[in-house]
């Protein structure tokens, strides 16, 4: 399964978990069932979901540092989760080049976000990737 589809699925799972206030595991199972997908084909999506949820506090601190005028709670759920996914890949996945993580996030924003999502996501990620060491989580 292509990584783009895996990222789309991970985003859907993270969104569902946050909105429905359920565990990532339960949201993943629901998503697999809803779309008739085989969990074995979505191992990278599962890894992204698990990784983002395990490090969500660290990722959110980065987002908060960069988005001075936007509190996390004010951000659209989909935008917040796209940024979390991208930051997870930037800081915790050495096999994913930074430009790939950012470009994939922009595609997710174009597909799942609002008219302004792509610009918003690009602004946040752009600041981080300009100086990744400045924002690297502890």
Swiss-Prot record:
GO terms for MF: RNA binding
One example of a Gene Ontology biological process annotation: DNA-templated transcription termination
Keywords, alphabetical: RNA-binding, Transcription, Transcription antitermination, Transcription regulation
Residue ranges crossing the lipid bilayer per the database entry: none
InterPro entries in UniProt: NusB-like_sf, NusB_fam, NusB_RsmB_TIM44
Cellular component, GO annotation: cytosol
Family: Belongs to the NusB family.
Known role: Involved in transcription antitermination. Required for transcription of ribosomal RNA (rRNA) genes. Binds specifically to the boxA antiterminator sequence of the ribosomal RNA (rrn) operons.
Name of this chain's protein: Transcription antitermination protein NusB
Organism: Desulforudis audaxviator (strain MP104C)
Lineage: Bacteria, Bacillati, Bacillota, Clostridia, Thermoanaerobacterales
